[in-house]
Amino acid sequence: MKILVIGDSCKDVFIYGTANRLCPEAPVPVFIPKRKTETGGMAANVYENIESLGIEVDLITNQEVITKTRYVEEKTNHQIIRVDSDANKSQRVEGLEHIPYSDYCAVIISDYNKGFLEYDDIEYICSKHDTVFIDTKKIVNEKMLGAKFIKINEHE
């Protein structure tokens, strides 16, 4: 069994610490960082989850590094703020016509609408494989109807 994941990826950074007082200059919490974790996010998270199940998986994703850094109060696990860097647009995917789709038992499209995949790309992928799962932030349209499953997301 081999699965292909295609879509936008990011690096998810979590900085855990404490925020026990307000800043004297402005009514904002003073955050004291204690530990940091990093994981793959978006399509990279899908890839890591599938890989953790022992399933062979390939990932086609953006080259640009999009980072989402969350500052989390460690006692309550509440996010205080999220800081995004380079999160506007990804370079569009290239080479979809060169992928050996028949080598995969399924294709997962993880589209966060950052520009890596356009509607025509999704339609093309759906035309090349019988088992396509779509998780998208785009408005679902007729170009996606070739997919087996579609998960709809709210706008972030």
Language-model region placement:
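Ribokinase/PfkB-type carbohydrate-kinase core domain
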Residues: 1-22, 26, 34-156
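Central beta-strand plus flanking loop segment that forms part of the substrate or channel wall
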Residues: 31
